[in-house]
A protein has these predicted regions:
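Elongated alpha-helical scaffolds that mediate protein-protein interactions in large eukaryotic proteins
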Residues: 176-182
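Eukaryotic beta-rich interaction modules
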Residues: 135-145
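Intrinsically disordered, low-complexity activation-like regions
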Residues: 5-131, 166, 322-352
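Fungal C-terminal regulatory tails
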Residues: 13, 19-79, 91, 106, ...
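Extended, leucine-rich alpha-helical cores of fungal transcription factors
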Residues: 110-122, 143-161, 182-283, 307-367, ...
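Non-membrane alpha-helical segments in proteins
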Residues: 126, 130, 158-176, 209-217
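Short, flexible helix-coil linker/hinge segments at the edges of structured domains or between repeats
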Residues: 279-304
Length: 564
């Protein structure tokens, strides 16, 4: 049974001006009467935007430090705009939005967005904070509701549209909305993507927020290009820096950290998906780990309406995903970067070199999985609550698969058969576990928020099965992998009506392995050519037996299947 809507005083429902009152126009948040979280904000100012001044900029820190900064705002006038000092060597150049030609007509665009969703704007915002926000906390709920309570015209158009777009995915989960006709999401998407390019010229934190939310859409296009753009914007905003001691509101410090790590995750998972080098590197990344105080909401803020997401579980999930993504970044750097490829090629033994690099990451992954909080286990579901933990477990399997994918690629006819057996057995265990995971998904998992990479990660399981298939060392093994791949493809196909992203995942998988399976089906499976298949595998030839091979103890952990 749905709980009655909370009163405005608890910050859970937006306060709007009465029908006869005009919207409150806020030129500068510092001039707001009464209490406001936004009074000293750096990254979400109204009618102004701020760009970080880097260490090699024409405005040298020593020269900037000589300027007179007022005590209230830590600002000093500039020839154009103003400078703001937030730390000993951290300065921002602030400009007026009006100086940008793209600013004209923004109010009309915001009004158009509201007309598209009218009269359901408030209900959609409640729906977004019920289902999406707990598992992907890149907004500040009270700040968002404070602004919306005054007027929708305080928002950046792409952010306002993006929140509505994602909320529309759960339209039927609101008893208030389910009885009404659904707004045209295509119109909202057109506005969101077009205005995102406009506001990128005068970017704020809301620009990155909008971009990240749009990238969570199941059918988002040009994701790599947009991700690249968001990383550049994030650097303009100083998101790559440690803001712990900056002179900005404490809520904004937490928001910046959450947003920075969300950007890091977007960049890393996009790099995996599209086979590109990540833009963000450890060398120029000073963001501190998120801690409890960086998340302003708690269980007390949780919505009790059926079909909501648990707030504290979402916070734990987000933190765990950050930790996992750091390990994925290490996999990409140590096993797939151009530098790593060159070093491995120049090594005496390619497989041994790969295993040496993989071992410490594998141990970290095993420890991460073993130490996973109970709240994030697949069976830790509550009646009437959606659970997004599925995307975390899927991301774990994708990371494991990416690691073992590189190991399998290193194997050749010259690799000792015993080492081949060890490596392939470990890869097989990961594949079976990943496929079994899919069968454990419940409706409360499938209907929740899923991270953008999930559709690709589901397809990656099938791609890995295809790799195991074509690198098989015996016909029996080849038939096993062919059968499992066919079963997985079928299961994904018949399940794709459960969620939109599964339908997309099914299409991605078909593109990746459809031709392979068609070719394998068109001929006798024992006549199919496998590069790793040795002639002696069928006739019992023992010429390559491993009687003189003694794998070093450092690779012994591969004997442990480490099934989750």
């Amino acid at each position: 049974m749905a709980r009655p809507r909370r009163s405005d005083s608890d910050g859970n429902a937006p306060r709007r001006p009465s029908a006869g009152a005009g919207p409150v126009i806020v030129d500068d948040y510092a001039n707001l009467s009464g209490e406001s979280l936004l009074k000293k904000t750096l990254g979400l100012q109204n009618h102004r935007y701020a760009k970080y001044i880097g260490p090699t900029d024409e405005h040298d820190f020593a020269l900037l430090d000589l300027r007179l900064y007022d005590d209230l705002r830590n600002e000093a006038p500039a020839d154009l705009g103003s400078f703001r000092k937030v730390g000993p060597n951290e300065f921002f150049h602030q400009y007026a939005d009006a100086d940008s030609p793209s600013h004209a007509g923004e109010v009309e665009v915001l009004d158009r967005i509201e007309r598209i969703v009218a009269p359901h704007g408030e209900a959609l915002i409640r729906l977004y904070f019920r289902i999406v926000h707990p598992s992907f906390p890149i907004l500040h709920k009270k700040v968002y509701l404070e602004k919306y309570g005054r007027t929708h015209r305080e928002f950046s158009p792409p952010l306002l549209a993006a929140v509505y777009i994602l909320a529309l995915n759960w339209w039927s989960y609101s008893s208030e909305l389910a009885r009404s006709a659904k707004p045209d999401v295509a119109q909202l998407e057109d506005i969101a993507y077009n205005t995102l390019q406009d506001v990128s010229q005068r970017a704020k934190l809301s620009t990155v927020q909008a971009g990240l939310l749009l990238l969570q859409r199941p059918g988002s296009n040009q994701a790599w290009q947009l991700t690249s753009q968001l990383v550049a914007i994030g650097q303009d905003l100083g998101l790559h820096l440690d803001c712990t001691n900056w002179r900005i509101p404490s809520w904004e410090k937490g928001l910046r950290k959450r947003l920075a790590w969300a950007l890091f995750m977007q960049d890393t998972w996009s790099a995996l998906i599209y086979g590109r080098p990540p833009h963000i590197s450890e060398t120029n990344w000073a963001v501190q780990p998120v801690i409890g105080s960086d998340f302003p909401e708690s269980a007390a803020d949780e919505d009790e309406e059926e079909g909501s997401t648990e707030v504290e579980k979402g916070r734990t999930l987000f933190s765990a995903m950050i930790a996992l993504t750091k390990m994925l970044a290490q996999v990409l750097e140590d096993l797939y970067s151009l530098k790593a490829e060159t070093q491995v090629k120049n090594s005496y033994d390619t497989t041994k070199a790969i295993l040496e690099r993989a071992k410490p990451i594998q141990l970290k992954l095993r420890s991460w999985y073993a130490d996973m909080p109970e709240a994030l286990r697949m069976d830790a579901t509550r009646v009437g609550k959606l659970s997004s933990v599925g995307y975390l477990h899927l991301a774990y399997f994708a990371t494991e698969i990416t690691l073992h994918r590189r190991i399998l690629r290193s194997l050749s006819h010259n690799t000792d058969p015993y080492l081949i057996q060890i490596c392939r057995s470990a890869a097989k265990a990961r594949l079976i576990s990943a496929m079994d995971f899919f069968n454990r998904l419940k409706p409360e998992h499938l209907q929740s928020f899923w991270y953008f990479a999930s559709k690709f990660n589901f397809a990656l399981i099938g791609t890995f099965a295809g790799l195991c298939f074509v690198t098989s060392v015996s016909h029996d093994e080849a038939e096993f992998y062919q059968r499992r791949l066919l079963e997985y493809r079928w299961t994904l196909r018949v399940s794709n009506k459960s969620a939109e992203f599964l339908e997309i995942a099914s299409g991605i998988l078909e593109s990746a392995v459809g031709s392979l399976l068609k070719a394998a089906d068109s001929i006798d499976s024992r006549g199919f050519s496998f590069p790793m298949l040795q002639p002696h595998a069928e006739d019992g030839d023992t010429s390559m037996e491993h009687q003189n091979f003694s794998p070093s103890a450092e690779f012994g952990y591969y004997d442990d299947q480490m099934e989750p």
